[in-house]
C-alpha cells in the first residue's frame, strides 16, 4: 500500500469500480455472427438502396469468398487488405476474411498511392479483396473481386477448406493510426478483445436485434467496427448509404431506411436538423470534443449518449447514460469493456485521486495486442502494470498490459469520467495555460456560428497568435485565396466582429483571438472529424494581411512608421521578410498580438532608439497604436523628459463619485438582525478558484459552512468540476457547495438581476477575494473587475437584510495614512484599482457602523502569500518566487538589503484570518494587516541550507547583473514580465521601511514554509 498515494477512501472507490476486471469473452467475431445467421436467417442484416442482404445471404456469400481466400493461403494471422467505396460488399468482405481465419485492414481508395503502398508493405499483403473500379491500384497483387452482381448468385453454406480453426487470441482486424514519424501505425486487435468489449458496449449503447444502425463512418475509421461488427453480433440491421447518399442525402437516407441508431461526430451533427429526422432514437456523439450546443440541441429529441474510445482498446472505452440538457459536454460516462485509471502524465506509477486531472490509462480484456512490427511504439504505449496495481492483480504471473491514451481526463465521485483534452492541446499565453476547447465552446454558442476552430499556429505569419476560423450560417465575403476552393479562408467581416464582441463578454481578454477568418466548409477527415491539420496548413500558408480600416501611418511620422515596422517585425517568424504593404499600417497593438511580454521588449526598443521610457501600460491600452505611442514619445521629447508621464486619471474624483452612489444605497439599506441563522445561510465567495481562493474555500467547507462560489464557466456542472479536481476535495463537501455562474468583468457580475435578488436572501457573509492581477495594464483595463465588481458587491450586501459580514481582500502597494495618500502613491493600474476599491469598502464600513446597520465590514491585507510548510504549494508567477529563482540562477544577491523585511504569510494563516472576520463580532479595526515577515537574509539562509551557493554583492553590482541577465534572456527571463515592478522596487525584494515584527516561533514556521515552497518549485522545474 505504500505505493498508493491517493486517500484511502478514493482507493476503495477505485477497487469498487475497477475490480474485478470485466471477463474475457473467449469467442471469435464470426462465430457470434454465424449464430445470428442460424437463429434468424431471413432477417435483413444489411439494408441499402443498392441491395439488401439477409443474415442467411450474408453468411452464405461470406462463406463462398472465405473458401477462395483459404485456397489463396489465408489463415490465422494473415492480413487481408479490403478496398471498397461505400457498399454492402465491404461488409461481406469483412466477414469473409474473418471466416477464413485472417485479419482484415481497410484501405481508402481515395488515399494517396504512397500511403496505400506503405500499408500494403507493412502488413505484408499478398492478396486484396476489392471491386472492379479499384483493381488498378493493386496490379502487383492477387485480387478477389466482389460486386453487387455476386449478391444474385446462389450462396453456399459448404464448409471451407480445412485449416487451423480460428482462436479467440488470433488477430481479427487492424486499424491504422497516424504516427509521429510520418509512418502510420497499425493497431492489431484480437477477436477476444473486441468480443469482450462488445459484450459490454453494445447494451450500454442500446444496440440490440431491433437496432437499425447507420453505417456512417469511413471504413478506415474505428467507429465503423461498432457500426458493422457490433450490429451483426447483436442481430441488428446495418443501414449502409452510398458515398453520394452519405454526403448529399443523409437525412433522406435515414428517414427512408428507418434508421434508429447512429454514432456521429459532434462537428458533423451540427449540419443536421433533428426536426427533419423522424426515426432516430439513439445518437452517440464520439470522436471529437462534444459541444454544449450539441447537447442542448439534441438531448430533448433523442436518447443522446456521449462516448470515448481509442482504436488500441477495441474502439469503445466509456459510454454515458442518456443526457439531459444540463449534462456537461465533457462527460464521457462509465467504462464499458475495460476499466480506466487516472495517472500522472509524466509518471504512470503515480495514481491520481478522484477529481484530479491526469492521463487516462486503460486496463482489461479490450486492450489490443499492440502495433504491428513496431515494438518500440508498442512498449511506449502498452505498459506493464504500475507499482500501485501490483498487489491487486488477479494473476500476477500473467498480468495484462495497460494502454496509455495520451488523453487527459478525471474521475467523478460517482465513478463516471470527464474528458478534459488531448495532452498537448493546452497552449500557454502570457504564462497562462489556456484550453482552446473552452474558447471554441463559447464561440460555438453564438447563433451565427455553425462550428468553429481556434488554433495557435506554430509556423507562418500568424505563429503564436490565437486564430479563430468559423463556419457560419451566413455566407463569407472576400476570399483570400483564388476562389477555386470552398475551404479558402476569408477575411473577417461584420459578422465576425459581432462574434468577437460576444466572446469578450464570456472570456478574459487574453483568450480572445487576435485574428478571425471564415470558411465556407471545414475540411473533414474520412472519419467526419474536422481536419485540424488541414486548417493549420491553410493558416500557415496565409501571408499576414492588414485591415485597411486601420489606416497607414503618415509618411512624415518617422517615429510612428518605425514603431509600426517594429510591431510588424515582432509578429513575424524570425527571418521572415516584411511585406511592404503592411509594414506601416496603424494597427492597434493588441490586434497585432502585442501582449505584456512583447510590450516590455517594445518599450526597451523605443528607449534605445529615442531615449524615452514609455510605461508598459501605454502599450496595453485598448486604443494603443503606432501613431499614439509616437505621440507619447514626442510629448516626452518636447518636455525634455526621458520618460512619458501618463496623464493621471482623476482617481479622487472617481472615488468621491462612487462614495456618493454608495451613500444613496446606505440610506435605504435595511437594519440587520444580530440573530444567528443557524448555518442555513451561505457565504458568497469570489475568486474561489484562485490560489488563495481555494484555501479560503477549503477552510470554509472544513468548518462546515455552506458556500456559494461565483465561477466563470460554461455551465454549473463544469463549474463544480473545477473544485472536484482539487486534491483536498471530499465527497461530503458536495452538499455544502453551490456554484453561481458569473463574471466579475461583466455588469452586475454577469448575473441576472432576479437571481441576484434571490441570492440576497441566502447569503450571510460576502468574501470578495476575486481580482484581476496584472502589473502592466492600466487602471481603465482593470476597472471593471477590480472596482465595478466591488461596488456591485457592496450594493448587494447593503441591500440584503441577511448579509451581516463583508470581507474584502486587498492588495497593491503599502498603505499610507489616508485614502488620498494611497491613491497618490500608487504607480501601477493594479495598485490604483485595488486601493480605490479598498477605500470604498472602508468608507462603507465606517458609515455602516455610524448608521448601525448591523453590517460588519473589514479589509484583510496580506503581503506575499506562500504555501504552508505541510504542502508547500507555491505560486510560481508571484514576484517573490521569480526574484528568488533569479537569485538562484545568478548565484548572487544584494547585500545592501539583507535587513530589509519581506512581508510574507502562508495560505492557511491568511485563510484563517479571513474566516475570523466573518466569525467574530464587528470591531472598529476595519483594516486587518497580516503582519508576518522575514528579513531577506532569512530567505538566503534557507537557500544555503538547501545547498545553493550564494555570494553577496553590492547593490550596484546586483542591479547590473540582473539587468544584463534580463537583456540576454529577454522574454525567457523569470522577471521579464514584471520588469516594471522590479524597477519600481529599485531591484529589491524587501523594504527596510517595513516595521512588521515576527516572533521566533513564527519566524521558524515561515522559514520552514519557505523551504518547503522552494523544494516544491524545484520539483516542478521552476527553480
From Swiss-Prot:
The modification O-(pantetheine 4'-phosphoryl)serine is found at residue 596. GO terms for molecular function: ligase activity; oxidoreductase activity. The keyword Ligase applies. Signal peptide: none annotated. Its EC number is 1.-.-.-, 6.3.2.-. Its cofactor is pantetheine 4'-phosphate. Residues 685-901 form the Thioester reductase (TE) domain. The keyword Acyltransferase does not apply. Keywords: Ligase, Oxidoreductase, Phosphopantetheine, Phosphoprotein. Residues 54-454 are annotated as: Adenylation. Residues 554-637 form the Carrier domain. Pathway: Secondary metabolite biosynthesis. Belongs to the NRP synthetase family. NRPS-like oxidoreductasee; part of the fragmented gene cluster that mediates the biosynthesis of fusarochromene, a tryptophan-derived metabolite closely related to a group of mycotoxins including fusarochromanone. Within the pathway, fscA acts as an oxidoreductase that reduces the carboxyl group of 4-hydroxykyrunenine to primary alcohol. The first step of the pathway is the epimerization of L-tryptophan to D-tryptophan in the presence of the NRPS-like tryptophan epimerase fscC. D-tryptophan is subsequently hydroxylated by the tryptophan 6-hydroxylase fscE to yield 6-hydroxytryptophan. NRP synthetases are composed of discrete domains (adenylation (A), thiolation (T) or peptidyl carrier protein (PCP) and condensation (C) domains) which when grouped together are referred to as a single module. Each module is responsible for the recognition (via the A domain) and incorporation of a single amino acid into the growing peptide product. Thus, an NRP synthetase is generally composed of one or more modules and can terminate in a thioesterase domain (TE) that releases the newly synthesized peptide from the enzyme. This is NRPS-like oxidoreductase fscA. It comes from Fusarium equiseti (Fusarium scirpi). The gene is fscA.
Amino acid at each position: 500500500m505504500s505505493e498508493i498515494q491517493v486517500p484511502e477512501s478514493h482507493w476503495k472507490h477505485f477497487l469498487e469500480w475497477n475490480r474485478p476486471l470485466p471477463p474475457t469473452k473467449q469467442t471469435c467475431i464470426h462465430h457470434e455472427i454465424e449464430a445470428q445467421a442460424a437463429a434468424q436467417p431471413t432477417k435483413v442484416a444489411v439494408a441499402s438502396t443498392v441491395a439488401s442482404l439477409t443474415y442467411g445471404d450474408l453468411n452464405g456469400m461470406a462463406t463462398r469468398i472465405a473458401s477462395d481466400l483459404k485456397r489463396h493461403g489465408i489463415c490465422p494471422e494473415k492480413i487481408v487488405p479490403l478496398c471498397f467505396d461505400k457498399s454492402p460488399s465491404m461488409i461481406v468482405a469483412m466477414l469473409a476474411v474473418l471466416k477464413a481465419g485472417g485479419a482484415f485492414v481497410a484501405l481508402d481508395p481515395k488515399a494517396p498511392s504512397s500511403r496505400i503502398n506503405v500499408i500494403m508493405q507493412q502488413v505484408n499483403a499478398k492478396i486484396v479483396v476489392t471491386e472492379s473500379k479499384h483493381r488498378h491500384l493493386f496490379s502487383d497483387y492477387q485480387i478477389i473481386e466482389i460486386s453487387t452482381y455476386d449478391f444474385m448468385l446462389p450462396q453456399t453454406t459448404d464448409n471451407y477448406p480445412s485449416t487451423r480453426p480460428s482462436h479467440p487470441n488470433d488477430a481479427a482486424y487492424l486499424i491504422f493510426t497516424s504516427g509521429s514519424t510520418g509512418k502510420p501505425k497499425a493497431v492489431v486487435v484480437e477477436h477476444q478483445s473486441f468480443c469482450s468489449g462488445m459484450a459490454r458496449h453494445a447494451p450500454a449503447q442500446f444496440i440490440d436485434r431491433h437496432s437499425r444502425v447507420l453505417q456512417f463512418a469511413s471504413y478506415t475509421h474505428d467507429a465503423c467496427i461498432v457500426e458493422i461488427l457490433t450490429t451483426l453480433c447483436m442481430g441488428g440491421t446495418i443501414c449502409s448509404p452510398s458515398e453520394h447518399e452519405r454526403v448529399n442525402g443523409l437525412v433522406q437516407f435515414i428517414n427512408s431506411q428507418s434508421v434508429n441508431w447512429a454514432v456521429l461526430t459532434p462537428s458533423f451533427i451540427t449540419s443536421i436538423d433533428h426536426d427533419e429526422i423522424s426515426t432516430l432514437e439513439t445518437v452517440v456523439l464520439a470522436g471529437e470534443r462534444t459541444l454544449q450546443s450539441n447537447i442542448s440541441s439534441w438531448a430533448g429529441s433523442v436518447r443522446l449518449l456521449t462516448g470515448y474510445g481509442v482504436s488500441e482498446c477495441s474502439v469503445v472505452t466509456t459510454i454515458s447514460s442518456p443526457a439531459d440538457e444540463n449534462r456537461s459536454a465533457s462527460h464521457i460516462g462509465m467504462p464499458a469493456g475495460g476499466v480506466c485509471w487516472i495517472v500522472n502524465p509524466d509518471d504512470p506509477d503515480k495514481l491520481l485521486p478522484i477529481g484530479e486531472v491526469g492521463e487516462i490509462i486503460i486496463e482489461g480484456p479490450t486492450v489490443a495486442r499492440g502495433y504491428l512490427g513496431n515494438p518500440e511504439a508498442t512498449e511506449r504505449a502498452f505498459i506493464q502494470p504500475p507499482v500501485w496495481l501490483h498487489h491487486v492483480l488477479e494473476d500476477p504471473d500473467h498480468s495484462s498490459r495497460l494502454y496509455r491514451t495520451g488523453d487527459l481526463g478525471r474521475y467523478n465521485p460517482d465513478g463516471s469520467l470527464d474528458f478534459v483534452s488531448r495532452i498537448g492541446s493546452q497552449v500557454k499565453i502570457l504564462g497562462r495555460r489556456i484550453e482552446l476547447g473552452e474558447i471554441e465552446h463559447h464561440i460555438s454558442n453564438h447563433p451565427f456560428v455553425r462550428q468553429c476552430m481556434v488554433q495557435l499556429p506554430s509556423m507562418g505569419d500568424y505563429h503564436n497568435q490565437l486564430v479563430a476560423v468559423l463556419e457560419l450560417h451566413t455566407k463569407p465575403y472576400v476570399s483570400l485565396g483564388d476562389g477555386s476552393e470552398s475551404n479558402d479562408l476569408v477575411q473577417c467581416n461584420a459578422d465576425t466582429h459581432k462574434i468577437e464582441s460576444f466572446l469578450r463578454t464570456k472570456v478574459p481578454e487574453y483568450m480572445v483571438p487576435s485574428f478571425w477568418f471564415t470558411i465556407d466548409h471545414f475540411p473533414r477527415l474520412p472519419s467526419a472529424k474536422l481536419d485540424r491539420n488541414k486548417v493549420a496548413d491553410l493558416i500557415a500558408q496565409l501571408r499576414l494581411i492588414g485591415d485597411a480600416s486601420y489606416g497607414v501611418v503618415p509618411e512624415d511620422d518617422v517615429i510612428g512608421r518605425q514603431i509600426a515596422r517594429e510591431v510588424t517585425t515582432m509578429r513575424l517568424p524570425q527571418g521572415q521578410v516584411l511585406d511592404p504593404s503592411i509594414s506601416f499600417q496603424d494597427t492597434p497593438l493588441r490586434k497585432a498580438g502585442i501582449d505584456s511580454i512583447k510590450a516590455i521588449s517594445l518599450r526597451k526598443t523605443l528607449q534605445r532608439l529615442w531615449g524615452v521610457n514609455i510605461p508598459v501600460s501605454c502599450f496595453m491600452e485598448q486604443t494603443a497604436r503606432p501613431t499614439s505611442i509616437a505621440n507619447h514619445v514626442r510629448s516626452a521629447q518636447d518636455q525634455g523628459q526621458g520618460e512619458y508621464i501618463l496623464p493621471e486619471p482623476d482617481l479622487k474624483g472617481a472615488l468621491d463619485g462612487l462614495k456618493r452612489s454608495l451613500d444613496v444605497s446606505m440610506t435605504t439599506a435595511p437594519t440587520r438582525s444580530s440573530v444567528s441563522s443557524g448555518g442555513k445561510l451561505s457565504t458568497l465567495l469570489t475568486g474561489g478558484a484562485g490560489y488563495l481562493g481555494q484555501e479560503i474555500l477549503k477552510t470554509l467547507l472544513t468548518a462546515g459552512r455552506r458556500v456559494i462560489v461565483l465561477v466563470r464557466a460554461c455551465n454549473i456542472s463544469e463549474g463544480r468540476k473545477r473544485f472536484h479536481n482539487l486534491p483536498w476535495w471530499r465527497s461530503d463537501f458536495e452538499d455544502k457547495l453551490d456554484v453561481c455562474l458569473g463574471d466579475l468583468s461583466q455588469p452586475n457580475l454577469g448575473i441576472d438581476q432576479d437571481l441576484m435578488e434571490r441570492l440576497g436572501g441566502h447569503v450571510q457573509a460576502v468574501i470578495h477575494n476575486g481580482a484581476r492581477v496584472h502589473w502592466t495594464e492600466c487602471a481603465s483595463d482593470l476597472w471593471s473587475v477590480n472596482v465595478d465588481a466591488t461596488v456591485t458587491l457592496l450594493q448587494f450586501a447593503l441591500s440584503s437584510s441577511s448579509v451581516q459580514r463583508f470581507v474584502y481582500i486587498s492588495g497593491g502597494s503599502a498603505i499610507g495614512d489616508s485614502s488620498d495618500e494611497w491613491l497618490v502613491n500608487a504607480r501601477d493600474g493594479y495598485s490604483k484599482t485595488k486601493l480605490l476599491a479598498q477605500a470604498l469598502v472602508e468608507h462603507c464600513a465606517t458609515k455602516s457602523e455610524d448608521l448601525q446597520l448591523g453590517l460588519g465590514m473589514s479589509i484583510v491585507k496580506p503581503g506575499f502569500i506562500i504555501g504552508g510548510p505541510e504542502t508547500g504549494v507555491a505560486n510560481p508567477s508571484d514576484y517573490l518566487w521569480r526574484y528568488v529563482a533569479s537569485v538562484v540562477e545568478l548565484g548572487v544577491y544584494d547585500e545592501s538589503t539583507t535587513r530589509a523585511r519581506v512581508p510574507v504569510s502562508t495560505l492557511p494563516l491568511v485563510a484563517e484570518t479571513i474566516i475570523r472576520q466573518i466569525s467574530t463580532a464587528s470591531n472598529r479595526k476595519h483594516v486587518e494587516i497580516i503582519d508576518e515577515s522575514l528579513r531577506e537574509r532569512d530567505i538566503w539562509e534557507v537557500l544555503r541550507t538547501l545547498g545553493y551557493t550564494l555570494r553577496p554583492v553590492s547593490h550596484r553590482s546586483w542591479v547590473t547583473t540582473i539587468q544584463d541577465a534580463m537583456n540576454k534572456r529577454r522574454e525567457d527571463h523569470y522577471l521579464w514580465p514584471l520588469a516594471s515592478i522590479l524597477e519600481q522596487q529599485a531591484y529589491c525584494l524587501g523594504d527596510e521601511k517595513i516595521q512588521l515584527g515576527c516572533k521566533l516561533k513564527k519566524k521558524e514556521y515561515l522559514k520552514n514554509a519557505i523551504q518547503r515552497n522552494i523544494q516544491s518549485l524545484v520539483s516542478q522545474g521552476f527553480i
